Every structure is written in structure tokens, then in C-alpha cells.
Amino acid sequence: MFAEAAKTTRPCGMAEFKEKPEAPTEQLDVACGQENLPVGAWPPGAAPAPFQYTPDHVVGPGADIDPTQITFPGCICVKTPCLPGTCSCLRHGENYDDNSCLRDIGSGGKYAEPVFECNVLCRCSDHCRNRVVQKGLQFHFQVFKTHKKGWGLRTLEFIPKGRFVCEYAGEVLGFSEVQRRIHLQTKSDSNYIIAIREHVYNGQVMETFVDPTYIGNIGRFLNHSCEPNLLMIPVRIDSMVPKLALFAAKDIVPEEELSYDYSGRYLNLTVSEDKERLDHGKLRKPCYCGAKSCTAFLPFDSSLYCPVEKSNISCGNEKEPSMCGSAPSVFPSCKRLTLETMKMMLDKKQIRAIFLFEFKMGRKAAETTRNINNAFGPGTANERTVQWWFKKFCKGDESLEDEERSGRPSEVDNDQLRAIIEADPLTTTREVAEELNVNHSTVVRHLKQIGKVKKLDKWVPHELTENQKNRRFEVSSSLILRNHNEPFLDRIVTCDEKWILYDNRRRSAQWLDQEEAPKHFPKPILHPKKVMVTIWWSAAGLIHYSFLNPGETITSEKYAQEIDEMNQKLQRLQLALVNRKGPILLHDNARPHVAQPTLQKLNELGYEVLPHPPYSPDLLPTNYHVFKHLNNFLQGKRFHNQQDAENAFQEFVESQSTDFYATGINQLISRWQKCVDCNGSYFD
């Protein structure tokens, strides 16, 4: 990714015309389903070298702190929104505006205020404005093969300036492991390791090393640019280990390649960037970003190639190249400070001694908390803890020792907890708490740490027998093979019936004050009013739909009549399909669909019927695609009569584009494949 690039005359960051993304039938998801949105790859059929995908940091060799551990306390904003002055997470001011854009993201890249988001322990809602990076990807991206730079990443949507784009996630490493990996690299290897350096206290710098080479996310595909459109900001949420969040430094248009300055700067070049050979003899890798201000070489951090005792962090005014992927070196020469050093700088007695000193100086708990966190880093002191000790001092007790307590332990062994849960996934958290003799909240907290979440069993249409599973497997595998040898998806005509309820409202929970009474909701009647619709469509679009009259049911004669009407419309819409290729009907095995009058009509019209296994609505495009979107459209709507329901359905079908129908048909391939992968069982 870093090693190869090509000069070009197109605007910096824009793909060439021949690199314009197409719409392949099957889209590879580089993110393996672990992001909010799939991340495609281009050109069709190509894929990056395999790596283990993770949307968040994972602990790597030599790391001081596990990035998945929760180390920050939460705010207590329950009835009021999180605001500076009242929310402990916003002690440095607001981070985002009403549009979820980073505030004060100046064109000079001078954004230096610490960013702390509300975390899992905060009592504010999930809709809090201070929760942005933790929500993951909000735009569609595509990994694509560049002309000579290897793989890159581009957006398929417009991204406003200041919006969060993605993280640079990977293994969090110790400095010795970073040096070991870098010294093992050859000239042809790409370097993905990034070092973030943050000023902490008294000239000390806190460093975070991240390597997505083997375990990472889409951030590993970002290429360097001397005029980048992204800016990297360390954002802390649950842990002292920052998330390396990339924000749009300007408005980014669709199909524009995403890039950032590997040195961590933004349009803030230093001198001596044109030095080709470094002091220790290593050749700089050339930069071909195509920017007007291109420095000709990729950024480089010589400190990572030196022994630990000789490695110093350079001043911003020193003539020394910066790291390939590091934050700007704008701090004085200073001692290397790791996260673990930061945590261990003060033990309990030392920090309690500071509490006592501040108390005797007459300072308040809030002021004491601010002073300590400003001096030793965020999260060192908690205001409620300081208040507890101040109350103790007020009583004349100035002992700094812990009082003996007979309560339950606040920690559990995660391996033991995992073994209990995996042995019986149906066990409750309270049963686990009783078995381990800990509080219920302790079990919940540790379950989150080991990545366990509670999920209900998923409803399935039927409890399949082995014969039915085998039939699903055989049909799906045969259709995959047939389509591979002779594509036929564009010949498929599919249909199904659905009841549309007059009342589509659902009872839902509400956030209310404790003494406030909930709203009333009428109990559903046993036989609600409804109307049945039959819809026929293909990849080219809608063909025909009709509604049953009240009291009317679908019979084989009625269904044969529907086929006749559909065929007449199909001849007007897709005459070539009817006369030359021949349509292929895909429907389920309902009794009217397989009755003799229906089979005679299909034989008369020359329709082929595609094999379909019983109890398989997950393999019918009308069920998994059209009706799914129709249900979302109807949610919350209420109709007074059949005409209102018919008008709503007509509004739904008229709002869909041709691509909507093609997408539903094209999903058949992936669904057949999932069925094969699950040996005929239902799949998620």
C-alpha cells in the first residue's frame, strides 16, 4: 500500500475514469459483516490479501493496557443532555455539533483539544450527541485497486467536512514489538504501523502504537497524501487507549479516494522532507500522491529504527523526518512515556496524599479532580471518589489506608466466566453472580469485556427435518451451478401473496418519568381487518399486482387467471423474454400454486417452473426483499378501508426504482450459497 504509487494528472484523491465502480451482481464485504455497512471491493472478482478483520483495537504483544478494558468512569447525565460544565465527559468543551461534525476542525490541522466521548458506563441515552465514533461507519465505502499504489479506499457518498469517516484499528503494540516488526520488514513490505504521540505533562509524551497488518479494519487501505482529505484525531471512549479516528478535513465527493498524511500533520509541512537517504542508510520510499505540494517521499520516523535508550522524540523545529503514519512531533525532547507508565505514575497512597493536601489547602472536590487530571492525565481521579475522601477527612480521619470490607469481590476471572457461559448459554446473569459470589453488575460488566451479548433465539418458519434440509441443499447447489454455466436470473418472474392489515401500529416502550403514566394502546382484536395482495415482478421491475375482494380466497382457478393477466402484461413490458428466452417462474409450493389448473396454464404458456424446496421463504425474493421493505413502509400506518390500504401499496411500489427489483433478484445467489454453507438449515 505504501510502497507503490504513480504520478497522475487527475485531481488529487480522485479515481481515474476507468476505475469508476461498477455494480457487480455479488458484492464482496471486506468488513466480513462486522461493520454497520458492507464495504465492497473493485474491480469485481478481485480481493485484497486476506487479513483478520476487527472494527476496534485488540491487545497485541507488549501492550501496556488491553484496549477493550473499561477504564473511564461514566457521566451521570440522566434527565439533562450532556453539556460542558455539567457532563464529566465534556470537561474540555463540546466535541461535536448538531450534525455530528467535529467542532473547530481548522484547515491548518490545529485541532488539539482532547476528545472524550460518552461511554458504556455513562447514564445518558444512546442518542447523546457526544456518541459519534462509537457508532461505527455511517457512509458506504469501497476498497479499490489503484493504478500503481496498490489498494486504496474511496467513498461512495458525499461526506461533509468534520464528519467521522472511519477508525484506524489494529493490534495495540509495545514499543519493543514495534521495533522487532519493523526490523523484520523487507524493502518490498508495506508498513502499516502508526505511532500516535500526545503531550501529557511536564514535557512527557504518551505513545500509542497500532499495527493493522494482520488484524485490522478498512483504515489499513488508506493511502498517504501530502494534501489529504482526512485528519486523524485520538478519541477516547471506554479506555485510556485512544481510538484513532479519521474525520473529513473538507467536503469529500463520491468516488474520491480517502487519504491522510502519514506524518499526522495536515497541510503543515516541515523542512528537509526531500532527504532521500536517511542517516542509517535506509532509502526513503517515494510519494506519488500527485499533490502540488508533494514532498516526493513518504514520511518516516527514524526513532522506531533506533534502540530504545537512544530513541528521542524530535522537536517540531528539528530537521528530522517524521514517522510514516505518526502524529506530528511538536513536543520537546523528552522521556518516552507509555500508557502503563502513566497509570503507575501514582499509586493509591500517593494520589490519596494529594487528596489530603488539596483538602488542607481548602480546595473543593471538583477543583481537586480537575487539578489532578490536568497534571496526570484524564481519568486519574474521579470526582465522586474525591468527595468520599473529603467527607472522611472532614470527620477527622486522615488515614490513607483502605477500610476492611466484607462485601462481595468486584472482579471475576474472565476465563472462568467464559467457561460458565459457554457451558450453558441459557443461564442468567443473576445465576452466574450467585455462583461466583459477585454482584450482578460485576457479571454484566465482565460479560461485555469478553464480548458476550444476550440474544433471543431467532424465529424460523418451520422446524426442518433432515430430508427437508437435504432438499434445500440439493436445490440451492444445483441452481448455483446452473447459473454459473448459463446465467438465468434475468429470466426469473416471481410472485407471492401477502395480507395487508388495516392497523399496522405496534405497542412500544416509552421513556417517561417514574411517576408519569404510560399512554394507552388498544388491545389487538382477534380477527383484524385486512386485504390480500398478489404481486408479480422480475429483475426488470414490477409486472402486475391485484387485490382480493372481501370474502374471496386464492384458489387454483383464481391463481391461473392471475397468471394469464400477468403474462399479457409481461408481453407488453418484456416481449423478448416471452418470445425468445422464455420466462422462468419462481414461486412457493402453496396448494393453489401446484394444483392441476395452475400446471396446465403454465404448460400452455410455455413457462418453466424453477425448483423450490418446501418451507423456504428465505429463498423467495418476494418474501425476503419486497415484503420486508413493504413491512417497514407500512409500520405505524392505519387505514380506514380497503381503498386506503390499496392506495398505500400503490404508493410503495411507485416509490421503488428499477434497481430495487434487480437487487432483490440478484440476492438469490448469495442466499443459495448461504443455504449450501449451512447444509440446508436456515441461515441468518
Swiss-Prot record:
Mg(2+) binds at residues 496, 588. Zn(2+) 1 binds at residues 75, 77, 82, 87. Widely expressed, with highest expression in placenta and ovary and lowest expression in skeletal muscle. The modification N6-methyllysine is found at residue 498. Its main location: nucleus. Disulfide bonds: none annotated. Its EC number is 2.1.1.357, 3.1.-.-. Residues 283-299 form the Post-SET domain. Residues 139-263 form the SET domain. InterPro entries: Mos1_HTH (IPR041426), Post-SET_dom (IPR003616), Pre-SET_dom (IPR007728), RNaseH_sf (IPR036397), SET_dom (IPR001214), SET_dom_sf (IPR046341), Transposase-MT_Hybrid (IPR052709), Transposase_1 (IPR001888). Methylated. Methylation regulates activity in DNA decatenation. Phosphorylated at Ser-508 by CHEK1 and dephosphorylated by protein phosphatase 2A/PP2A. Phosphorylation at Ser-508 is enhanced by DNA damage and promotes recruitment to damaged DNA. It stimulates DNA repair and impairs replication fork restart. The keyword Transmembrane does not apply. It catalyses: L-lysyl(36)-[histone H3] + 2 S-adenosyl-L-methionine = N(6),N(6)-dimethyl-L-lysyl(36)-[histone H3] + 2 S-adenosyl-L-homocysteine + 2 H(+). It is found in: Nucleus; Chromosome. GO terms for molecular function: DNA binding; DNA topoisomerase binding; double-stranded DNA binding; endonuclease activity; histone H3K36 dimethyltransferase activity; histone H3K36 methyltransferase activity; histone H3K4 methyltransferase activity; protein homodimerization activity. Zn(2+) 3 binds at residues 82, 118, 124, 128. The modification Phosphoserine is found at residue 508. PANTHER family: HISTONE-LYSINE N-METHYLTRANSFERASE SETMAR, MARINER MOS1 TRANSPOSASE-LIKE PROTEIN. In the N-terminal section; belongs to the class V-like SAM-binding methyltransferase superfamily. Protein derived from the fusion of a methylase with the transposase of an Hsmar1 transposon that plays a role in DNA double-strand break repair, stalled replication fork restart and DNA integration. DNA-binding protein, it is indirectly recruited to sites of DNA damage through protein-protein interactions. Also has kept a sequence-specific DNA-binding activity recognizing the 19-mer core of the 5'-terminal inverted repeats (TIRs) of the Hsmar1 element and displays a DNA nicking and end joining activity. Homodimer. Interacts with PRPF19; required for SETMAR recruitment to damaged DNA sites. Interacts with PCNA. Interacts with TOP2A; stimulates TOP2A topoisomerase activity. May interact with RAD9A and/or RAD9B. The mariner transposase Hsmar1 region mediates DNA-binding. It has retained some of the nucleases activity but has lost its transposase activity because the active site contains an Asn in position 610 instead of an Asp residue. In the pre-SET domain, Cys residues bind 3 zinc ions that are arranged in a triangular cluster; some of these Cys residues contribute to the binding of two zinc ions within the cluster. This is Histone-lysine N-methyltransferase SETMAR. It comes from Homo sapiens. The lineage of its organism: Eukaryota, Metazoa, Chordata, Craniata, Vertebrata. The gene is SETMAR.
